[in-house]
Amino acid sequence: MDRWLSLLLLSVLGSFFLFPPKMARAEEKVTIGTVEDVLLLPWKVKLPARIDTGAAKSSLDARELKVAEDRVEFKLPGKYGGLQLRLPIVGWRHVRTPEGLERRPVVELEICVGAKRFRTLVNLTDRSLVKYPLILGRNFLREGFVVDVRRRRTSIPNCPDAP
Amino acid sequence: MLLETKNSGGGTRFLLLMKRVSKQNRAQRKFVSLPVGLAFLLALVLLLLLWEKGRAGEKLTIGEVEDVVLMPWRVTLPARIDTGAATSSLDARDLNVKNNIAEFRLPKKYGNLQLHLPVVGWQKVRSADFRERRPVVEITFCMGPRLIRAQVTLNDRSTVSYPLIIGRNVLKENFVVDCVRSNCLSPSCQEVSSP
């Protein structure tokens, strides 16, 4: 009898270690803070990103924006290297601002957050008045992130090179 | 006693020991398994206690939009959960500040209630081309099971879809935001249901 009781206790205890009730849920989604460093790929430019659940779409600070047919040319802010980029336009986004309706080109970017790569759509606009060059909005956060505002810079971007 | 100290190595070794013990005589087995069983029971109780404690301080997961109830008036408002906003803000129509009291109405869609609240501060807002000063008041609202007292800035938000923006000043009270979801919690504070 005693042996069976001990075995039962052991199995109950073992199940706690094997299936911790809270860990199982936390694993599905990655918790990030309100600001995270990300890498712009393939150029490996590091940018701090504001994680913004109030923004429907992500946006990037693009300086000297020039649209040529289906492509857009712009520079990253000087603070982050001032890299000149040329990307195909995949769409346009209409944004209501205090000055009226604005049309912003949308491009697809590859970014590295933590150890994972993501392809995500961002709209381009001059954000020189705002603190962060990249805003990650809900279209990106739906890829499996939850936001904890008590934290910031929870991850270091470190993606393995593409094969 | 000797067996018990050996047992601290781990579960599998414990199982092997149990097998070996079962081959020994009954009296000796009783002597061994009683303290071992007791130790495990104690560990189990401790683990359960720790788990429960962890749950009490658990972070509440909320979606990108949540219904909150403004107290004590019990007005339900949909709120945009915004990690990009440092402070929260409320849609105030016909706003008027006299003698440090802010007078305003909630949007018609949410009952048009007239409110008078003391101004606790002013927030400078930098828009693209003009500067603005907005009054800050304190409100109490119920979000999920929690009654929250928080500062909100007042401004006319008639061009925006949500009458209340919940920013980081509220979200730092142990909430995490999951954008795949909305309306995760229904307001369930005692104060909402009691007369």
Where are the predicted features?
Chain A
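Bacterial N-terminal signal peptides
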Residues: 7-18
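Pepsin/retropepsin-fold aspartyl endopeptidases
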Residues: 24-163
